[in-house]
Amino acid sequence: MSTENTLSVADLARENIRNLVPYQSARRLGGNGDVWLNANEFPTAVEFQLTQQTLNRYPECQPKAVIENYAQYAGVKPEQVLVSRGADEGIELVIRAFCEPGKDAILYCPPTYGMYSVSAETIGVERRTVPALENWQLDLQGISDNLDGTKVAFVCSPNNPTGQLINPQDLRTLLELTRGKAIVVADEAYIEFCPQATLTGWLVEYPHLVILRTLSKAFALAGLRCGFTLANEEVINLLLKVIAPYPLSTPVADIAAQALSPQGINAMRDRVAQTVQERQYLVNALQQTACVEHVFDSETNYILARFTASSSVFKSLWDQGIILRDQNKQPSLSGCLRITVGTRQENQRVIDALRAEPV
């Protein structure tokens, strides 16, 4: 029998895909809980009514109402907005549009969001890491030393999973370092919790700046899978060349347009205020809990904390149906768990469970 006839289907796959470790999303990790505080979702659902019923027709590639509503909300021109299946698709589009596999590299600064790495590896693009400094700010010298051959640099601000904003002066320095050399992608998935820190006002000054946004967090629409890329028109036109013909279904576009109406944006801001209030309650309670070593500052809808025995705490709460996010495998996050801010009842269950832990 010839070798060709004995190859498995897996052997036919690209080598980098066979070796790929997929992103471990909260849903993929599973669990049988009733308090889900591991995916940075809003804890309660928002109701919408569909107004578009023409499901026999293909949708617009870039639904006009969604684009115009988001442009108005973000303070940019409609030509500077692209809508996609979550911000994750935006990550992939930028890499596909700007990076030559086997030639170019992306750069990111762990501990940070895992999809930058996974998307690049899937496409066959080199990944370079410049670990963040001890305070989780950018190592600008390390980044500068790694820019040769780097085509895209990803920065998450506020950073997931650490929760802090990146120093704006460091971001400006990074944009100057990369001018004419690389695209800088600022991931602003959590910017609604600290809107004063957005970089949208910098888009005119830095044509190589790309900003990622989402409806999954403050807009409470993680199940919708709707994200946005903000950039200058030239970048958007390049991304439109590689995006799928119909990225948003008609129901998704319908709900997204409603969420981005003046009424929808006001409701989002009310949710943010509620989340910030609950975050402070949770921080105060964690700081008075014996098994908690340190609670890190957060500008988001989640809190990172270091525990005296994080593995046993994580498992104990898991067994009680309280699902948190273990960060022990992330660089510099040994002993850390990430806790999404939930409802008052959910937050109290977390605190009660933690205070029952042996010290």
From Swiss-Prot:
Alphabetical list of InterPro entries matching this protein: Aminotrans_II_pyridoxalP_BS, Aminotransferase_I/II_large, HisP_aminotrans, PyrdxlP-dep_Trfase, PyrdxlP-dep_Trfase_major, PyrdxlP-dep_Trfase_small
First-level EC class: transferase
GO BP of this protein: L-histidine biosynthetic process
Keyword Ion transport tagged: no
One of the record's GO molecular function terms: pyridoxal phosphate binding
Pathway the protein contributes to: Amino-acid biosynthesis; L-histidine biosynthesis; L-histidine from 5-phospho-alpha-D-ribose 1-diphosphate: step 7/9
Catalytic activity: L-histidinol phosphate + 2-oxoglutarate = 3-(imidazol-4-yl)-2-oxopropyl phosphate + L-glutamate
Gene3D superfamilies listed in its UniProt record: Aspartate Aminotransferase, domain 1 (3.90.1150.10), Type I PLP-dependent aspartate aminotransferase-like (Major domain) (3.40.640.10)
Coiled coil: none
Keyword Zinc: no
EC number in record: 2.6.1.9
Necessary cofactors: pyridoxal 5'-phosphate
CDD domains for this protein: AAT_like
Record keywords: Amino-acid biosynthesis, Aminotransferase, Histidine biosynthesis, Pyridoxal phosphate, Transferase
HAMAP family attached to this UniProt entry: HisC_aminotrans_2
Family: Belongs to the class-II pyridoxal-phosphate-dependent aminotransferase family. Histidinol-phosphate aminotransferase subfamily.
Descriptive protein name: Histidinol-phosphate aminotransferase
